[in-house]
Amino acid sequence: MQKIRRDDEIIVIAGKDKGKRGKVLKVLADDRLVVGGLNLVKRHTKPNPMSGVQGGIVEKEAPLHASNVAIFNSETNKADRVGFKVEDGKKIRVFKSTQKAVDA
């Protein structure tokens, strides 16, 4: 079970976007996350009249490593760590500071 999943609210704890918050759009296999509005890079694209792509300089989100982000606990308004608990035979994610379920 992954500690950070899609649609989790995270906060960046290291790097150029340190302190910024965002929502996880995609989780990649090599411990990387694509976060909405963070770690923006500029990509130069060629125009392609066949598919209707105009071309030019496009800003898009690049993946961040999972070690540079922490899950955001809206109850405490701080970054938090994730632990696991077994309730009713199911493994659930909990915040380490409050022991409350992440998905609740």
Curated annotation (Swiss-Prot):
CDD domains: KOW_RPL26
Cellular component, GO annotation: ribonucleoprotein complex; ribosome
Superkingdom, taxonomy of origin: Bacteria
Keywords noted in UniProt: Ribonucleoprotein, Ribosomal protein, RNA-binding, rRNA-binding
A molecular-function term among this protein's GO annotations: structural constituent of ribosome
Name of one Pfam family that matches: ribosomal_L24
PROSITE patterns: RIBOSOMAL_L24 (PS01108)
GO biological process entries: translation
UniProt similarity note: Belongs to the universal ribosomal protein uL24 family.
Xref: NCBIfam families: rplX_bact
Summary of the function given for this chain in its UniProt record: One of two assembly initiator proteins, it binds directly to the 5'-end of the 23S rRNA, where it nucleates assembly of the 50S subunit. One of the proteins that surrounds the polypeptide exit tunnel on the outside of the subunit.
Subunit composition and interactions: Part of the 50S ribosomal subunit.
Name recorded for this polypeptide: Large ribosomal subunit protein uL24
Organism field: Pseudomonas fluorescens (strain ATCC BAA-477 / NRRL B-23932 / Pf-5)
